Each structure stands twice: as structure tokens, then as C-alpha cells.
A protein has these predicted regions:
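Alpha-helical transmembrane segments of multi-pass membrane proteins
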Residues: 61-63, 127-153, 179
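Alpha-helical transmembrane segments of multipass membrane proteins
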Residues: 35-40, 62, 152-156, 179-184, ...
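Helix-terminus/linker motif at the lipid-water interface of multi-pass membrane proteins
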Residues: 31-58, 62, 80-81, 118-127, ...
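Hydrophobic alpha-helical transmembrane segments in multi-pass membrane proteins
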Residues: 23-35, 39, 68, 100-113, ...
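Short runs within selected transmembrane alpha-helices of multi-pass transporters and secretion channels
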Residues: 68-71, 140-159, 165-177, 193-210
Length: 226
């Protein structure tokens, strides 16, 4: 290693920014979801709903940290297999990533249902917020199952130089389906089904992500040399 002047390369910077765009969009999904949920809960449930969702928000942050950890751990495996032009290994690691993510999210879902009251007590929730949280966790938490797989599919796509496809998945997921589902489902049910909205959005996003992935691999994975 040695210290040397670095020559600015606009093309390289542009490529780095382009490759990193899907990850940025993925990271923005959670705050967009939280914002939309809070605005909707204020309208239909009130302060107690927002207090309850603040607790659920902590759980979401923890769960999504697990998903992101798995997806980031899979990136070098995807990248190495792509660089070796080994389609068999690529699909093997994709299946493994989906299984690990789905299994982990299922464990998290089971734990938060079983320990909902304990978790609320840890965060000092009052009685109304605890009651709402305990009732809402099973309705909202199943979104983790599909969110985990969406995260892996996005990671798989941008790790194999399918930046546009990965960006499309994250835009659909975080900026179209989630806000629309929260607003529309809440409006139709007068707020009664608001807790199911994110799960529905993640399910639709997963179906779209699968379609985009399979379409991009029609005829096999296309390997790029650049």
C-alpha cells in the first residue's frame, strides 16, 4: 500500500452512484412507511395509535436490520458467482438467501406475537397503547415475511448488475405500493384494516419482484464484462 494522488474519474463516480441507487431506495422504504402509517393512524385512531406504532416501529427497525444484514452478507456471494459467470451458484445462493431471510422473519414474527406484552412493557407503553400494540402486532408483523424476501431479491438484482430492475423493485415497493395500500385500505375500511396494509403492499411487491427477476433472466442470466 502507498499514499498517492487520486485522479478524479467522473465516469467511475457516475457508475458508483448508479450502482448504489437501488440500495439508497431500499433504505428509504422504512421511513416512508413509518411516515405514511403515522399520518394515517393520526387520522383514524388518534394519539394512542401513534404511540402503539412507535413501539412497533422499534420492532420493525430491529427486524429490518436482520434482513439487511442477510442481504449484505449475500452480496459478495452473488458478486463472486456473477464474476465467475456461474449461474448455478447464483441461483443456489439466491435460494439460500430467501430461505434464511424467510426463516428469520418467521422466527421474529413468532417471537413478537408471543412477547408482545413484554416488549410493550420494555418501552414503557401505557395501557391503551399496549392494548393496541398487542392486537396490531399479528396483523402488521406478517409483512416481515415478504419484506425479507423483497430485500434479498433487490440485493440479488443489483449485485448482478441489474440496477434498473433493482431500482424498479424498490420504487414500486417503497414509493408506490406501500403508500397506496396504506391510504386506500384505510379509506375503504375507515381505518379498521390499516394494520394489514403494509403486509398487502409487501406481498404485491414480492410478486412484482419475482416477475421482474424472472423476466430479466429469460433465456438465462446475462453476464456483463464491464
Amino acid at each position: 500500500l502507498r499514499i498517492a494522488p487520486v485522479k478524479f474519474d467522473a465516469a467511475l463516480v457516475g457508475k458508483i452512484l448508479t450502482r448504489g441507487l437501488p440500495e439508497m431506495l431500499s433504505q428509504l422504504t422504512t421511513p416512508v412507511t413509518i411516515l405514511c402509517m403515522n399520518l394515517t393512524l393520526i387520522k383514524y385512531i388518534g394519539d394512542d395509535g401513534v404511540n402503539a406504532y412507535s413501539i412497533i416501529g422499534y420492532i420493525i427497525s430491529f427486524a429490518y436490520a436482520i434482513f439487511m444484514g442477510v442481504s449484505e452478507g449475500m452480496q459478495p456471494l452473488f458478486g463472486r458467482s456473477y464474476g465467475d459467470q456461474n449461474e448455478e451458484d447464483l441461483h443456489y445462493f439466491l435460494r439460500a438467501g430467501v430461505i434464511v431471510s424467510f426463516g428469520g422473519s418467521a422466527v421474529v414474527y413468532g417471537l413478537i406475537i408471543a412477547l408482545g406484552g413484554v416488549i410493550c412493557a420494555m418501552f414503557g407503553a401505557d395501557a391503551p397503547a399496549t392494548a393496541i400494540s398487542v392486537a396490531a402486532i399479528p396483523r402488521h408483523g406478517w409483512a416481515f415475511l415478504f419484506a425479507s424476501m423483497n430485500t434479498i431479491l433487490s440485493s440479488y438484482l443489483y449485485s448482478t448488475k441489474r440496477t434498473r430492475e433493482s431500482a424498479a423493485v424498490n420504487i414500486l415497493r417503497g414509493f408506490i405500493f406501500t403508500p397506496l395500500c396504506i391510504v386506500l385500505i384505510s379509506a375503504v375500511s375507515s381505518g379498521a384494516a390499516v394494520w394489514y396494509a403494509v403486509g398487502v403492499a409487501e406481498l404485491i411487491s414480492f410478486l412484482c419482484a419475482m416477475f421482474i427477476t424472472r423476466r430479466s433472466e429469460r433465456g438465462g442470466v446475462r453476464f456483463s464484462e464491464d
